Curated annotation (Swiss-Prot):
GO terms for molecular function: ATP binding; ATP-dependent protein folding chaperone; unfolded protein binding. Acts as a chaperone. InterPro entries: ATPase_NBD, Chaperone_DnaK, Heat_shock_70_CS, HSP70_C_sf, HSP70_peptide-bd_sf, Hsp_70_fam. Residues 580-602 have a biased composition (Low complexity). It comes from the Archaea. The lineage of its organism: Archaea, Methanobacteriati, Thermoplasmatota, Thermoplasmata, Thermoplasmatales. It comes from Picrophilus torridus (strain ATCC 700027 / DSM 9790 / JCM 10055 / NBRC 100828 / KAW 2/3). Belongs to the heat shock protein 70 family. It holds the Pfam family HSP70. SUPFAM superfamilies: Actin-like ATPase domain (SSF53067), Heat shock protein 70kD (HSP70), C-terminal subdomain (SSF100934), Heat shock protein 70kD (HSP70), peptide-binding domain (SSF100920). PANTHER family: HEAT SHOCK PROTEIN 70KDA. This is Chaperone protein DnaK.
Amino acid sequence: MSKIIGIDLGTSNSAAAVVISGKPTVIPAAEGVSLGGKAFPSYVAFTKDGQLLVGEPARRQALLNPEGTVYAAKRKMGTDYKYKIFGKEYTPQQISAFILQKIKRDAEAFLGEPVTDAVITVPAYFNDNQRQATKDAGAIAGLNVRRIINEPTAACLAYGIDKLNQTLKIVIYDLGGGTLDVTIMDFGQGVFQVLSTSGDTHLGGTDMDEAIVNFLADNFQRENGIDLRKDHSAYIRLRDAAEKAKIELSTVLETEINLPYITATQDGPKHLQYTLTRAKFEELIAPIVDRSKVPLDTALEGAKLKKGDIDKIILIGGPTRIPYVRKYVEDYFGRKAEGGVDPMEAVAMGAAIQGAVLAGEVKDIVLLDVTPLTLGIETLGGVMTPLIPANTTIPTKKSQIFTTAADMQTTVTIHVVQGERPLAKDDVSLGMFNLDGIPPAPRGVPQIEVTFDIDANGILNVSAKDLGTGKQQSISITATNKLSKDEIERMKKEAEQYAEQDKKAKEEIETINNAETLAYTAEKTINDAGDKIDESSKESVRSIVKDLRDAISSKDINKIKELSEKLTKEIQEIGTKMYQSQATQGTSQNSSQNNNSQNNNGDTVDADFKESK
């Protein structure tokens, strides 16, 4: 059986690894390791003569060919964005596929055998569309993607391979080029389980580069009256120098930044020269690193843990090599971070271990990921009814019984949504389909079983089945919307910000739904009762029902509550009179009538679907 390689498909840089003789080994790029230990920079370039460049060769020529170079395509995965390059269009999947093809070729050269299968990692916050897009990119590259796993989960595998007999609470602090992911995991008896995830979608190494760029540019402007940031070529040179300085200051106390002929004036060429110390660098990045506190606090809160409960700290991503970053995280938790694995390589190595597990080369490891956001369907009144809560371990399958909202309803619409808001309109629509052919029946009678099934890659399949007829429809959620990692984080923040407002809105909808059900039940009760209820009682009920429906139409919540209470009391009084009347008719009739008046209190969720028009 051929090897299953592990691939860390990153925003700034990618990496790959494979398990050889039981140990994960990093796969080198054909060009060797570049600046800062980067094997496969996530750059794709097209030259004007039609040549395709990928990785370090593409990165090196980016300054001279900006219009033909694509960088950070990962941010566009799962969207319908198109890159327009020299008259041709490319999807993010195609761009990512070029990087994966490069990794595949170099892996085959390294191993001396064909490579067909891979495990690819994605950020913990990637939604169904983004995960599917990643699988599609693998397929375009000629790879059979055996599994999509979360990056922090892969990192845990890289560190946990030799610790199979311990029970641990682990925090993974993954600081990359543009994002921070904080994940807390439980590890025991070979099982990795995600407890919580958090992050900042605009915090990473590029922010540090930009801080250095701004500092140097401000200095240069004060001395020469020229803002280098307004000159594209000068800015690119400055940014490259800033990144180089950042990397060097992880191991030395000062570094020389020397950019001759950075610009020119009427007086001649201008040069930039500056000695940047580690102390000054740490001063520049301190506000950036301090932004880690909120995601760290949020992750602990989500896992219901305290700082002292954490047993291990794992640092992932190039910026975590910076001593100041490492010290910040260690000081936060009051313990030392783990060593022994290169932060730039850990994710790829963990993916390789998962590949070896799938290939049967490594035993006794079970991987349990979670879904990042709540999944559910839209029900009557626009309410989002959850089926699978956020942070549920996957793979998972959940079913729930729903019913119709109107008499003689023959079609229901299943609207699948994802998010943390109580109302479906505030969440993200993932897909919609109809279940037709439901036999006509009074509202509340049909039983529709809705099933959510998430596979090990986080891909969602939804089905709806009429239990009466056996008819079934389903949908597989693929890359059809534009929910990005930024939007996921925004949605979580909005859920907190609008919690009280959402609660009130949901309560109002539930009040209206309950009132409609009450009005329907009241009318049905007096109609079914016939002459067992006197006409004055019937007229009283009809009058209240009319007023209640008027209040529902005008959405007068206080009036709805008042009339609902009044109608409930009226129905109870009628029920009492009917019972007393029946009690005088003998034991047999009494028993029969009691059976007929029983309520159906099964698990069916009443009146949850609008009729499809």
